[in-house]
């Protein structure tokens, strides 16, 4: 190869990027030698560029024998021969010897023979090689740095573009000459390539090469770059379909003719820049096209046969820099092949563009029948992919959860309970299971479908269920019920072979069917008989036997499904077991055990039987078609019934819906059979009905005789009685005889005397003894307390004393009894006693000691437990009180003392500790309730006896009435304990279900207290209760109505109580599981244990977050949720191992550095509680029960990295950084300053060209230095809108708001943990909005007040100086001396100013009229606004100041515009224009229009008077009343006014609740009277009645003083007389207008316009004429002025502010208007115009436009 030139060392040649760059340039095709050598010298400065050595080295390379080298070397040499022949003459001489050396050494560096040839050089060349190697390495380092910054990419593309242009020009010249020769040599391989869509002719690429020779190896491959061994031939023009269009691409691989037949060689030809641009356009858009990206890249690389270098070249064009950076570090090293690189880039895209998942749509996906399981899963795959952007194979757990949760609830529960390991199964394994359970569900749904039919008395038809009797539902509050058994006729059995002398009906010999004596006595619905015992009719379903009759196994064979009565009676005697279940509803008379009676009750012809109801014998119609028993209120004989409040609408015999009222349980008797039922009462029914409910309860059998009689057969009845004959029967009385009588409390006031030393009570040091006087007690309460205090004194519980202390007592009457109990208010004593540590365990901890194996329970209630512990004499003085002049004190622990529970519990524990080893059962003690739980009955009885004997010996008293002895179901601590677990008491369920919607605060508290005790049974108690608790904090008038959200929460809590599950008793020997979740404001969890392979709940735990926790990111909120749930669960697990299931990496969050979002104390609590050794955290791989139970969960997020997500969410934007951005668009410095009570903010910008700083923003303001810093940073963000910016600040507060705390405060509503607003919350909220405006932003913290010459130091100093100057930027007031100078720069007049400056003189570019300046039109508004100033000067002041220096024709109009748009002036200025007052329309007659109002007359009853005034005549009606409510108003109208004066047309009143109540409005609506309500807060709207109120009170006071009467009601008639007789302004009195004559008084006895001697007709005619004249006189005096129309809807107004912080508030948009009132947006009531101030734009159309329209 030659030794005249040095060779780069092999280590340098291994740089594949440089090598590939050289090859792309070297083999471009048509570049001159000089340009190639210049480019090579630029890339490799150590290589010589003598072109003369090119021919020598090329010739040496061609002459090397191929058989003397290896196979790889032969491939290279063969390629060089091809290139030499293809590039004849000048083209061949362009390749340098060093290029050939690099090519050979770079591609065959593993070949030892070739390496030795290249290293044989002269000794002088070796020294040069050493130097060149060092320089070459340095050059490579610089090249790598340049490649990282991507600076050389644009230059290389430009070079390639120029080369391509030169190549195209050269080829166009030779096309005609070579075309014919090419067709002759290569007729098959020559292809015509059309011009591509990027405008470049590429047809010469395949034809520009001359034929060359090759060896037997046509697939040339040199380092995977020069040729492609994968494809021997690649078409030069490929068409790729994209969105229906054809795009043609040229290849980076070219086919060159070899000259040996049709063989071609593939030579690499890099992508052109224009081709790369086209490929970038065709690439799927990011991030939407990430799912199609891998397929598109693979297809493109396969078509072009690209290698790793081509992938990198294409990646630089289509992928952003962050994606390429991520792709380079995914596997920690370079990808092994092209496919690996493609996969790396796709993975990097998914990391850089995280999928935005619509989890709401995914969670809402549900199964839609009749889909199969396979169709359902396929549909789920489509929904999951479309809404998450992920294939389900990449998110298996969320997809499986989505599929399982979308199934019907019953199918989901069956799937999870029947397959505990379902979460570990795959989708193909789950599909058969889902199909199985879906099939089961469809079959169950088909069974329960029923045909509707309206039944009588509206009760569902009960069905017979095997031998268990009638089973069905009972009526609810629904108005109608329509159910029917879906009966199908049973198939008739074949007649079989019946002997000729045998009856076909009864199968008895001796007669035939027609003469069968049993036919007329057939029972109804027996066998296959038809209705009424007739054969062949529609058959009834065979009904089973009564529950207490057990037929033999062969009864069907024996009787063939048919029986008559005699057979049934005989069989009953054989089948009777002697006893029947205790739950049997029949209450039989007590007879000897074992006896039985069968009763036949013969009905009358009217199908009636005699029934005794509450000792009243009545006839009742037997109706088997009636569902319910009904008592008729209109019958001849009606029994006494106690009715309830339950009422339904039922369909009776009349086929019309009739109301029925439910009666309380009533005892009825038929013959000797007694039963308790709850009949329904119909007051309009004339007969009594004995329905199917009572007949089925008595097991009655109805049959019909041949003569038409109907017989009711009552089966045998038996007694229920307790006996000790069986093993499981306990005689309680005999068992309790073994205990002494002093153990039992005989009276409610009986107390025990515990054998413990008296208790000494210590008080705090320097505490003053309270002495609170007893307020007087009413006589009835005093007499009610006297027996109680006397009894307590006789027992020594109370003693008389003289004490410095005294506290009051309160008598409380017992519900339903004429007795009182005493409440002693000891709060003052509780405040002075020394504190004690409470040792009373919670009910939850007490019950946690029970084991699931304990099935027998005994509950012992200690009577008056506190009173059994004595108090030392030295401490008794503390509890003194006064009663009837005597002072008493307690000698025992009193109720209400803060330490009574603790002291009693300590004494009881000490007492029971003595028998600790004598009892093997579990003992639970809570205050005075003792529970004994045992595994078996005998142990329980034995330990109970030991306990009771010990209590008797220790001086306790036990309540025998409350004793629950040896039962499997007991009531303890308000819960029902059973072997299965804990249940809610049925009485509590009934109380909750019947609880009406609360309308007062007290009712809400009562409801929350009722359901709050059962919160462990309610999965989402805290979520639902918070809506009701919000109402407690509101200051709302009672009664109120709950909103829709509160009603929904109320109903959900009721439903949760009524459908509560059974909670199992925790087993300490088994591990616990805690499934956790959380909503936005509450934590949710369920504590479970596995029993018999099933996960069963122990308790549902929920708790509300505080303000801090509510604003945390989801992952940290999960930590808070688990911590709260664990705190509640500790009372159950008691230190046992616990497995916590969660979807968050809790341990990772706690073990990393402490987050700035959580305080150190809170984080320490989390670490101490959540990192305990007995806790195990498990990632949920299945659907958490907490998620299934919780319907309000808002935190469902896909799988994620908790640390990364917390870091991302804690900032206002994900790309926010604190590191400088390279080459930003702007570099800003912000700073704030505060001094002498004033603040200022400034922003300066760095100019890199001149390296200086300019001020781009300055503003005064800021109540503190922190506020000024926030304003400065917000201004900097606003100035960098849509730009990349680096913002430097020296404020740690502003930096922390942006990076650490601001986003967290925004999430929790800018409040502290105490609920108070955060300081500067408005500025922080504004800053968080502004920081979203830049395209990319980095906020960097720098040190303040440092010295140096760096850009950061100088920029911060400039910002600090600008902020200090901004403090003193104030609004200057224009003065005469500087008026002209201040406007020199803006005095630019336009064409519109010509008409305003007419006649003015121009001086120095300013128009003057005398000494006054005529400003330009555009300046006028700014000048007047400045004069308006901070103090908001009025129009006269503005005009006066303006006229001193300026003049303009539009000045007054502009001032009006400024004042009309100034919000502050509109709020505080008085109303500028008085309004013409309106009047009421003239009524048509007297008492057609009334005004009413309440007025308070005194403080004693009757306190109020209802004043009613006739608007036409002013006739007053004043009625005293005790209350001012709606019922009083309705009573007076209906009993006094309307009967006396008739129905009015209209009634007016204010909007008091007594007038707006529903009863008042419905009353007037029903009688056709219009009730008009006046505008609130405007007494003049009710002026007539308001003036009457004032007159009335004044006259009452004067009359009382004149007549010396104390009661105002006594002088009211005289006042009414005077008011009705006094003439008004028209000269007529109300009496004259109404009666047609003056009222006769002492002074007017002889005055009358009528004559007594007239006839009746004449008198009436005169009276009519006189009334008409009076009425016309009233009409003439009535105001007739008309009011202008009201403001137009759509205009704006201000409303009077009642809070007086400003005179007016608003503005408000007017929606509707009348001449006197308006309806505005946001206010529910009409507003009188006296309370409105219309904006000027609403009154004058000339002032309604913008400024430019106003002044044009």
Curated annotation (Swiss-Prot):
Domain Reverse transcriptase: 793-977
SMART domains named in the record: ZnF_C2HC
Cofactor binding description: Binds 2 magnesium ions for reverse transcriptase polymerase activity.
Residues binding Mg(2+) 3: 1493, 1550
Region span, Disordered: 168-222
Active site per database record: 623
UniProt binding sites for Mg(2+) 1: 861, 928-929
GO biological process: DNA integration; DNA recombination; proteolysis
Keyword Nucleus: no
Swiss-Prot/TrEMBL site (Cleavage) positions: 95-96, 251-252, 457-458, 584-585, 722-723, 1372-1373
Residue ranges of every copy of the Integrase catalytic domain listed in the record: 1482-1638
Cofactor requirements of the protein: Mg(2+)
Pfam entry (one): RVP
Organism superkingdom: Viruses
Reactions catalysed, as given in the entry: DNA(n) + a 2'-deoxyribonucleoside 5'-triphosphate = DNA(n+1) + diphosphate; Endonucleolytic cleavage to 5'-phosphomonoester
Enzyme Commission designation: 3.4.23.-, 2.7.7.49, 2.7.7.7, 3.1.26.4
Biased amino acid composition, Polar residues: 201-217
Zinc finger (CCHC-type): 501-518
KW Zinc (keyword) present: yes
Coiled coil: 154-185
Binding site for Mg(2+): 1231, 1269, 1290, 1360
Composition bias type Basic and acidic residues, residue spans: 168-178
GO cellular component assignments: host cell plasma membrane; membrane; viral nucleocapsid
Function: Capsid protein p25 forms the spherical core of the virion that encapsulates the genomic RNA-nucleocapsid complex.
Miscellaneous comment as given in the Swiss-Prot or TrEMBL entry: This protein is translated as a gag-pol fusion protein by episodic readthrough of the gag protein termination codon. Readthrough of the terminator codon TAG occurs between the codons for 582-Ala and 584-Asp.
UniProt name for this protein: Gag-Pol polyprotein
């Amino acid at each position: 190869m030659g030794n005249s030139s040095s060779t780069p060392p092999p280590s340098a040649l291994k740089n594949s990027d440089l090598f590939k760059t050289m090859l792309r340039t070297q083999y471009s095709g048509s570049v001159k030698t000089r340009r190639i050598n210049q480019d090579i010298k630029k890339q490799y400065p150590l290589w010589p560029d003598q072109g003369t050595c090119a021919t020598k080295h090329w010739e040496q390379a061609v002459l090397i024998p191929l058989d003397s080298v290896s196979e790889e070397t032969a491939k290279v040499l063969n390629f060089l021969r091809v290139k030499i022949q293809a590039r004849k003459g000048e083209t061949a001489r362009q390749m340098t010897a060093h290029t050939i050396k690099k090519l050979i050494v770079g591609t065959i560096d593993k070949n030892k023979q070739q390496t030795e040839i290249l290293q044989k050089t002269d000794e002088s060349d070796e020294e040069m090689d050493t130097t060149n190697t060092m320089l070459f390495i340095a050059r490579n380092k610089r090249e790598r740095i340049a490649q990282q910054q991507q600076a050389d990419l644009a230059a290389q593309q430009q070079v390639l573009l120029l080369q391509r242009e030169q190549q195209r020009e050269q080829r166009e010249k030779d096309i005609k000459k070579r075309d014919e020769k090419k067709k002759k040599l290569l007729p098959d391989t020559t292809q015509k390539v059309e011009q591509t869509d990027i405008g470049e002719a590429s047809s010469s690429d395949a034809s520009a090469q001359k034929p060359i020779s090759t060896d037997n190896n046509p697939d040339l491959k040199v380092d995977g770059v020069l040729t492609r061994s994968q494809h021997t031939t690649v078409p030069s023009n490929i068409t790729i379909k994209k969105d229906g269009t054809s795009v043609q691409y040229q290849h980076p691989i070219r086919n060159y003719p070899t000259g040996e037949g049709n063989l071609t060689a593939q030579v690499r030809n890099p992508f052109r820049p224009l081709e790369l641009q086209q490929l970038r356009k065709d690439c799927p858009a990011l991030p939407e096209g990430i799912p199609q990206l891998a397929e598109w890249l693979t297809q493109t690389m396969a078509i072009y046969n690209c290698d790793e270098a081509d992938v990198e070249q294409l990646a630089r064009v289509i992928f952003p820099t962050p994606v390429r950076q991520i792709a380079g570090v995914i596997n920690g090293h370079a990808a092994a092949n092209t496919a690996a690189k493609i996969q790396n880039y796709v993975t990097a895209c998914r990391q850089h563009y995280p999928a935005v998942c619509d989890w709401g749509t995914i969670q809402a996906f549900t199964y839609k029948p009749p889909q199969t399981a396979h169709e359902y899963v396929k549909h789920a795959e489509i929904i999951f992919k479309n809404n998450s952007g992920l294939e389900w194979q990449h998110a298996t757990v969320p997809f499986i959860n989505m599929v399982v949760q979308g199934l019907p609830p019953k199918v989901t529960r069956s799937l999870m309970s029947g397959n505990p390991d379902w979460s570990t199964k795959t989708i193909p394994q789950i599909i058969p299971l889902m199909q199985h359970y879906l099939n089961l569900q469809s079959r169950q749904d088909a069974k329960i479908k029923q045909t509707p039919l309206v039944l009588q008395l509206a009760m569902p038809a009960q069905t017979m269920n095997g031998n268990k009797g009638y089973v069905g539902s009972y009526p609810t509050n629904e108005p109608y019920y329509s159910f029917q058994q879906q009966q199908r006729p049973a198939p008739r059995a074949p007649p079989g072979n019946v002997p000729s002398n045998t009856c076909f009906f009864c199968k008895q010999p001796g007669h035939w069917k027609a003469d069968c004596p049993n036919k007329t006595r057939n029972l109804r619905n027996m066998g296959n008989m038809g209705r009424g015992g007739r054969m062949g009719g529609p058959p009834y379903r065979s009904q089973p036997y009564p529950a207490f009759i057990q037929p033999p196994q062969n009864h069907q064979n024996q009787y063939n499904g048919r029986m008559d009565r005699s057979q049934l009676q005989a069989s009953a005697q054989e089948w009777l077991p002697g006893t029947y279940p205790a739950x049997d509803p029949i209450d039989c008379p007590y007879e000897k055990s074992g006896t039985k009676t069968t009763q036949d009750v013969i009905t009358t012809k009217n199908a009636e039987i005699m029934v005794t109801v509450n000792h009243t014998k009545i006839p009742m119609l037997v109706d088997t078609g009636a569902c319910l028993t009904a008592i008729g209120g209109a019958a001849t004989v009606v029994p006494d019934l106690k009715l309830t409040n339950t009422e339904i609408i039922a369909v009776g015999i009349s086929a019309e819906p009739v109301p029925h009222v439910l009666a309380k349980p009533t005892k009825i008797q038929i013959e000797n059979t007694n039963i308790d039922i709850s009949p329904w009462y119909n007051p309009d029914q004339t007969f009594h009905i004995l329905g199917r409910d009572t007949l089925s309860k008595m097991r009655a059998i109805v049959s019909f005789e041949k003569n038409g009689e109907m017989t009711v057969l009552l089966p045998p009845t038996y007694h229920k009685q307790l006996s000790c004959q069986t093993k499981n029967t306990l005689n309680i009385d005999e068992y309790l005889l073994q205990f002494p009588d002093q153990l039992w409390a005989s009276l409610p006031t009986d107390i025990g005397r515990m054998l413990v030393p008296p208790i000494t009570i210590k008080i705090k040091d320097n505490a003053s003894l309270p002495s609170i006087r007893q307020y007087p007690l009413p006589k009835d309460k005093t007499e009610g307390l006297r027996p109680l205090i006397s009894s307590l004194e006789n027992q020594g519980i109370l003693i008389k004393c003289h004490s410095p202390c005294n506290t009051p007592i309160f008598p409380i009457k017992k519900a339903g009894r004429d007795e009182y109990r005493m409440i002693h208010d000891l709060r003052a004593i509780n405040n002075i006693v020394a504190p004690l540590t409470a040792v009373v365990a919670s009910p939850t901890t007490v019950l946690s000691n029970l084991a699931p194996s304990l099935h027998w329970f005994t509950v012992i209630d200690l009577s008056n437990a506190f009173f059994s512990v004595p108090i030392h004499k030295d401490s008794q003085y503390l509890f003194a009180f006064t009663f009837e002049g005597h002072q008493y004190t307690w000698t025992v622990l009193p109720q209400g003392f803060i330490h009574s529970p603790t002291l009693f519990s300590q004494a009881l524990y000490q007492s029971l500790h003595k028998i600790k080893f004598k009892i093997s059962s579990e003992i639970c003690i809570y205050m005075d309730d003792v529970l004994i739980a045992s595994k078996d009955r005998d142990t329980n009885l034995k330990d109970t006896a030991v306990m009771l004997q010990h209590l008797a010996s220790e001086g306790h008293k036990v309540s025998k009435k409350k004793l629950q002895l040896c039962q499997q179901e007991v009531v303890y601590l308000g819960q029902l304990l059973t072997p299965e677990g804990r249940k809610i008491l049925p009485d509590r369920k009934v109380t909750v279900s019947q609880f009406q919607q609360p309308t007062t605060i007290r009712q809400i508290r009562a409801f929350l207290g009722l359901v709050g005790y059962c919160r462990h049974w309610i999965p989402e108690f805290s979520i639902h209760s918070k809506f009701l608790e919000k109402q407690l904090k509101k200051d709302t008038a009672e009664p109120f109505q709950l909103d829709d959200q509160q009603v929904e929460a109320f109903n959900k809590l009721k439903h949760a109580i009524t459908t509560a599950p059974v909670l199992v008793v925790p087993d300490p020997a088994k591990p616990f599981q805690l499934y956790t979740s959380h909503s936005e404001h509450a934590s949710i969890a369920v504590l479970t244990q596995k029993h018999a392979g099933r996960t069963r709940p122990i308790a549902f735990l929920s708790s509300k977050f505080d303000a801090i926790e509510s604003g945390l990111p989801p992952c940290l909120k999960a930590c808070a949720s688990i911590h709260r749930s664990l705190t509640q669960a500790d009372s159950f697990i008691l230190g046992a191992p616990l497995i916590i299931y969660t979807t968050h990496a809790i341990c990772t969050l706690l073990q990393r550095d402490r987050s700035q979002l959580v305080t150190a104390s809170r984080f320490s609590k989390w670490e101490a509680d959540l990192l305990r050794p007995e806790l195990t955290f498990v990632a949920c791989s299945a659907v958490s029960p907490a998620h299934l139970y919780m319907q309000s969960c808002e935190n469902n997020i896909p799988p994620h990295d908790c640390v990364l997500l917390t870091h991302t969410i804690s900032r206002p934007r994900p790309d926010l950084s604190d590191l400088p951005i390279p080459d930003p668009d702007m570099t800003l410095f912000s700073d704030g300053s505060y001094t002498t009570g004033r603040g200022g903010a400034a922003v300066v910008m760095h100019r890199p060209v001149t390296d200086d700083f300019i001020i781009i923003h300055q503003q005064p303001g800021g109540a503190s230095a922190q506020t000024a810093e926030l304003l400065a940073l917000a201004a900097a963000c606003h100035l960098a809108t849509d730009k990349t910016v680096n913002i430097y600040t020296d404020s740690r507060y502003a930096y922390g708001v942006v990076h650490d705390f601001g986003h967290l405060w925004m999430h929790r509503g800018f409040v502290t943990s105490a609920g108070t607003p955060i300081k500067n919350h408005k500025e922080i909220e504004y800053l968080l909005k502004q920081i979203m405006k830049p395209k990319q932003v980095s906020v960097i913290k720098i040190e303040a007040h440092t010295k140096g010459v760096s850009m950061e130091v100088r920029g911060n100093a400039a910002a600090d100086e600008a902020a200090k100057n901004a403090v003193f930027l104030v609004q200057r007031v224009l003065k005469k001396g500087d008026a002209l100078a201040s406007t020199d720069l803006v005095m630019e007049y336009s064409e519109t100013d010509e008409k305003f400056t007419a006649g003015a003189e121009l001086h120095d570019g300013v128009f003057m009229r005398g000494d006054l300046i005529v400003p330009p039109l555009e300046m006028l508004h700014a000048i007047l606004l400045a004069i308006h100033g901070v103090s908001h000067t009025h129009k006269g002041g503005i005009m006066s100041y303006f006229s001193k220096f300026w003049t303009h024709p539009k000045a007054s109009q502009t001032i009006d515009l400024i004042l009309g748009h100034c919000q502050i002036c509109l709020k505080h200025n008085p109303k500028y224009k008085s309004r013409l007052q309106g009047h009421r329309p003239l009524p048509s007659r007297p008492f057609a229009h009334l005004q009413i109002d309440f007025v308070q007359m005194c403080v004693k009853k009757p306190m109020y008077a209802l004043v009613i005034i006739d608007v036409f005549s002013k006739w007053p009606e004043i009625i005293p009343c005790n209350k001012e409510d709606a019922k009083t108003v309705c009573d007076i109208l209906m009993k006094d006014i309307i009967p006396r004066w008739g129905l009015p047309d209209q009634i007016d009143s204010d909007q008091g609740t007594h007038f707006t109540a529903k009863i008042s409005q419905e009353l007037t609506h029903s009688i056709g009277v219009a009730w008009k309500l006046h505008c609130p807060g405007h007494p003049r709207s009710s002026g007539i009645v308001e003036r009457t109120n004032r007159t009335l009170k004044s006259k009452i006071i004067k009359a009382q003083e004149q007549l010396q009467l104390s009661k105002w009601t006594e002088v009211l008639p005289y006042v009414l007389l005077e008011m009705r007789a006094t003439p008004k302004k028209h000269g007529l009195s109300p009496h004259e207008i109404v009666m047609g004559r003056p009222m006769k008084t002492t002074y007017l006895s002889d005055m009358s316009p009528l004559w007594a001697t007239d006839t009746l007709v004449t008198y009436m005619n005169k009276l009519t004429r006189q009334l008409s004249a009076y009425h016309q006189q009233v009409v003439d005096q009535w105001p007739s002025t008309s009011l202008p129309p009201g403001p137009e809807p759509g205009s704006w107004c201000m409303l009077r502010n009642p809070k007086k912080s400003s005179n007016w508030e608003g503005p408000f948009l007017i929606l509707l208007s009348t001449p006197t009132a308006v309806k505005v947006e946001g206010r529910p009531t009409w507003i009188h115009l006296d309370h409105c101030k219309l904006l000027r734009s609403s009154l004058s159309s000339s002032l309604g436009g913008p400024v430019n329209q106003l002044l044009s």
